[in-house]
Amino acid sequence: MRDISEIDKNLKVETTIQKDGLKFYDIKEQPFKVYGVFHDGERYRRMPDDVAKSVSDAIHYGVKYTAGGRVRFRTNSSFVAIHYKGEMGKMPHFAFTGSCGFDLYFGNTYVGSFVPPMGNNKGYESLIDLGDSEMKEVTINFPTYSFVEELYIGLDENAHIEAPTPYKVEKPVVFYGSSITQGGCSSRPGSCYEPYITRRFDCDHINLGFSGSARAEDEMAEYIAGLDMSLFVYDYDHNSPSIEHLTATHERMFKIIREKNPDLPIIMMSRPKYYLDSTEEKRLEIIKKTYENAKAAGDKNVYFIDGRDLCKLCGNEGTVDNCHPTDFGFASMAQTLGDFIEENGLL
């Protein structure tokens, strides 16, 4: 097949990477497969614009962060490069490799990170040499706190490119919650807790974590209720502004989703924190009460995880600021949640 960029120069990707045989491909084209986000003509996003706008201004903005986004494919290229266009989110307590970086996996094995530059905030290029030409199952995880307008994958022009092997569990696990759910403050996107679950159970997932903005609005609950999912996990304790708000919304969100999904496994979690003050303990009891009420009403597919149990591995050493997990904290969350899912046969 002839390279279309030879005919339409607007499709040619300009690059500063010096690599013989380098050719870029738009991930919107076959055989690449994008998960967790979709392109709306301007950028990749996590929810439809009209739905997000109906929830809140903060959600309308936050859906442009590409947390949970992935592109997957198979190739025997001896290198993989990216050419990324977008707006890069950078924060003092958050590694750039996490907030605005992409990382690379072969199957379940981390291979390397496409490290963003210090000075530029409008995208970048990066290349990882692999050293062999074996066929590989590739996953590239999107940044957790950045906007992605376009992403091109650079491969050897003579390499084979194939569609990825489908996930064993194709219906996604849907995660809803706070900045922790979104991925703050992992050192790279693949070390958030949700990708651990995807790798462990070979399942798709959708990240609906919204920094400071997860308030369990009815519009959000209705949107989630309409998704075709294999499992729903929710934890917005940190973002609920008061005990009164949490009381008014937590069970209500559960009931909205349960009404449309009578057989869906639903896991509710309290905030992942090792030590709780008296107010935080009251919040935990509100969340647990939703679970207890559902069980008392005969619900046989509802589950509860005490957020302190999410810290079993890391103890009190799992955050950057006594709130947002480090990679160690996320690994601890993933281990507890993954073991719970496995023990209860939820995937």
Language model regions located:
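N-terminal secretory targeting modules
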Residues: 1-172, 342-347
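Alpha-helical cap/lid subdomain in secreted, periplasmic
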Residues: 2, 64, 218-347
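Residue-level signal for short, function-critical loop segments
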Residues: 86-88, 179, 211, 238, ...
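Catalytic nucleophile-elbow at a beta strand-turn-alpha helix junction centered on a G-D-S/GDSL motif
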Residues: 170-191
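Short, solvent-exposed amphipathic alpha-helices that sit
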Residues: 187-196, 282-290
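Short helix-loop-beta junction
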Residues: 194-207
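Short beta->alpha junction loops
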Residues: 207-214
